[in-house]
Amino acid sequence: KRCIIIASRIGKIEFPKLTVVTPKTVKEALAKVDMTWFNYDDITIPSEKTQTKMSYVKPGGNWKDIPPEIGGYGPNTQSNIMRRLDPDKPSITLSNFRKSNILHPFENRILSVSEAAAIMGLERDLRFISDSLSAKQQMVANGVTQAIGKFVKNVVLKKLDEFTYGKSKTSKVVFV
């Protein structure tokens, strides 16, 4: 869960009434990812030992699915460690998907940078640029979904527009 705080020195911020929409499933989000995505090949290849551990984790499951003689995780390990995404449900929050080992729903590996971006609702042409794969992965993890970003942008632009132009019909804000 994320908390967004918007403060204003120019007046009270009015939030529009929220409408609840059914979020995309992991399968729906990943369906649009193909080789044309900019960071398509930015992926961590796990060791053979790690792939063996991953093979035990069922969709929606986590490290607890791994037999103790293979696992090496303690009882206080967080539930999102070695978590395989369920293809038929919305994704969990993607914090650092590399460090937590957030698993692809069908393959024994973590998500690629482009797959994580697609789950966040980001577009194909958005580029994560760094010499470091882990830095690219962290860039995605540090973000918010595109829907949240657009919502915050529109709330802030509306207030700035009202402050600058008043609440007239000549408003300059374009909601995307």
Label every PLM stretch briefly.
Residues 2-176:
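S-adenosyl-L-methionine-dependent DNA methyltransferase catalytic core
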